[in-house]
C-alpha cells in the first residue's frame, strides 16, 4: 500500500479539480491511500482510503515562499510536507506556490544525505511521443560540475523507475555536440559525466534537437533549464494560437480543420503536459510532486499517479543507496 499526502487547497482551480482527481485515483488504484489536507468546509468526499485533516491556513500564490512556510504552520502545504517528513506518507502532491513547495521540500522534508543540491525535473514531450526527462528546471540557478553529475545520476534513476526505460541515454545540454564546446561548467561537467560508469552518457545535446527524441535524460543547470522550459512552453502556446487563427480564418480552412480534427487532437494530446504529470523535486528524503498551477483534474490525477509509481518503485530508497551517503 502506498500513502500519498495531498494539498487540497493549492492551484488555480482547487479544491474542485483536486477532489475530482483524488476520487478517481482511489477508485483506480486499490493499493493507494490518501491523506488530504485542506478546509473541512470544502471537503465533499467519503472514502475509506481517504483520511481528511483540517487546516486553518492556506499558502497563496503571491506569498513569499520561505516566510509563508515559516509563518503558516497550519497551512495545507506545510502539514502535507510534515506528513512526508514524519513517515506518515510516502510522498506528496501540490499544485500550489512553486517556491513555497520547494522550500517545504528543502526545509521540512529535507535532502537525502550526500545530495548537494536537489533538482527540479519534468518530463517533456518529443515528436515520437516517448518524451524525455529534463533537469534542473529551476531549483538552483547556479550549479557546479559536481551538481550536474548528481543530476545525471538522479535523472537516470528517475527515467528507469518512473518512465520504465531500461538503459536511459543521458545527455548534457550544450551549445554544440563536440566535447570541447561550451563554457567552463559544461566542459568540466562533460568529463565528469563521461567518467561515471553508473549511467549511459551519450554526450552533448543542442537545444534545437531536444524534441526529436534522441535521448532520455537531459541535464543542465537550473538557470538554463528554466529558460529552455519556458521557451518550449511559450513556443507551444504560440504554435497552437497560430494554428487556431489559421483554421478559423476562412470557410475553406474551417472545413480543412474538420477533416484534420482527429490528427490535430492526436498532436495536441502528444504535446499536452497533463499526460506526463507534474514536476518532481529529486534528491529529497521523500517524493515531492509539483502539479502545474493551472492543472485540470486529469493533470492532477497524472501527478498523483506519478507519486504513486515513485512509492511503488521505492525511488527515494534507491536514490538514498546509490547517490546519497557520499561526501558533498
Curated annotation (Swiss-Prot):
GO terms for biological process: fatty acid biosynthetic process; phospholipid biosynthetic process. It catalyses: a fatty acyl-[ACP] + phosphate = an acyl phosphate + holo-[ACP]. One of its GO terms (molecular function) is phosphate:acyl-[acyl carrier protein] acyltransferase activity. Its EC number is 2.3.1.274. Homodimer. Probably interacts with PlsY. It comes from the Bacteria. This is Phosphate acyltransferase. Pathway: Lipid metabolism; phospholipid metabolism. The gene is plsX. It comes from Staphylococcus haemolyticus (strain JCSC1435). The lineage of its organism: Bacteria, Bacillati, Bacillota, Bacilli, Bacillales.
Amino acid at each position: 500500500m502506498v500513502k500519498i499526502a495531498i494539498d487540497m487547497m493549492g492551484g488555480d482551480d482547487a479544491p474542485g479539480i483536486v477532489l475530482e482527481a483524488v476520487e478517481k485515483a482511489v477508485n483506480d488504484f486499490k493499493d493507494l491511500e490518501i491523506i488530504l489536507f485542506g478546509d473541512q468546509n470544502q471537503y465533499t468526499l467519503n472514502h475509506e482510503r481517504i483520511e481528511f485533516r483540517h487546516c486553518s491556513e492556506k499558502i497563496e500564490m503571491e506569498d513569499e515562499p520561505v516566510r509563508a512556510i515559516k509563518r503558516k504552520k497550519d497551512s495545507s502545504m506545510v502539514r502535507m510536507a510534515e506528513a512526508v517528513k514524519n513517515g506518515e506518507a510516502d510522498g506528496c502532491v501540490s499544485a500550489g506556490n512553486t517556491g513555497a513547495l520547494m522550500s517545504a521540500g528543502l526545509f521540512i522534508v529535507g535532502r537525502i544525505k550526500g545530495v548537494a543540491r536537489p533538482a527540479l525535473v519534468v518530463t517533456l514531450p518529443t515528436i515520437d511521443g516517448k518524451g524525455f526527462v529534463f533537469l534542473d528546471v529551476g531549483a538552483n540557478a547556479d550549479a557546479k560540475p559536481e551538481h550536474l553529475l548528481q543530476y545525471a545520476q538522479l535523472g537516470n534513476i528517475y527515467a528507469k523507475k518512473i518512465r520504465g526505460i531500461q538503459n536511459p541515454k543521458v545527455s548534457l545540454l550544450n551549445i554544440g555536440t563536440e566535447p570541447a564546446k561550451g563554457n567552463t561548467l559544461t566542459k568540466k561537467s562533460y568529463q565528469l559525466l563521461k567518467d561515471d560508469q553508473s549511467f549511459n552518457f551519450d554526450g552533448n545535446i543542442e537545444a534545437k534537437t531536444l524534441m526529436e527524441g534522441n535521448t532520455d535524460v537531459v541535464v543542465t543547470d537550473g538557470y538554463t533549464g528554466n529558460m529552455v522550459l519556458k521557451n518550449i512552453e511559450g513556443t507551444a502556446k504560440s504554435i497552437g494560437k497560430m494554428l487556431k487563427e489559421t483554421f478559423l480564418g476562412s470557410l475553406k480552412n474551417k472545413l480543412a480543420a474538420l477533416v484534420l480534427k482527429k490528427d490535430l487532437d492526436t498532436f495536441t494530446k502528444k504535446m499536452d503536459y497533463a499526460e506526463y504529470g507534474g514536476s518532481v523535486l529529486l534528491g529529497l528524503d521523500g517524493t515531492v510532486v509539483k502539479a502545474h498551477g493551472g492543472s485540470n483534474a486529469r493533470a492532477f490525477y497524472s501527478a498523483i499517479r506519478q507519486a504513486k509509481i515513485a512509492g511503488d518503485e521505492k525511488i527515494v530508497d534507491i536514490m538514498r543507496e546509490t547517490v546519497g551517503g557520499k561526501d558533498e
